[in-house]
């Protein structure tokens, strides 16, 4: 079974999204990856974000980012 892919930029992890990565890694239904740079420097500077199946998902806080990731997945099922 293909799992949704959640990608984080290491620069954004240092800016606060590390806690979101740790929460999402606990979900066995997700593939969570960390990369050196995802090429979204402007968005990265603004606040917590992740790529969810290649689409940018943001949140004002870590909690909001996690909620927005799950909301995006609910609204955009893979199959």
From Swiss-Prot:
Source taxon at top rank: Bacteria
Q: What is the similarity comment for this entry? A: Belongs to the UPF0349 family.
Its protein name is UPF0349 protein BC_4937
Question: In the record, what lineage is assigned to the organism producing the protein?
Answer: Bacteria, Bacillati, Bacillota, Bacilli, Bacillales
InterPro entries for the chain: DUF1450, UPF0349
Which Pfam families does the entry mention?
A: DUF1450
User: Matching HAMAP family, A to Z?
Assistant: UPF0349
């Amino acid at each position: 079974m293909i799992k949704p892919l959640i990608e984080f930029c290491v620069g954004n992890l240092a800016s606060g999204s590390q806690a979101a990565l740790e929460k999402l890694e606990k979900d066995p239904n997700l593939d969570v990856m960390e990369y050196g740079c995802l090429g979204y420097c402007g968005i990265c500077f603004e606040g917590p974000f992740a790529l969810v199946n290649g689409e940018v998902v943001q949140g004002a806080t870590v909690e909001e980012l996690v909620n927005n990731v799950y909301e995006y997945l609910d609204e955009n099922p893979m199959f």
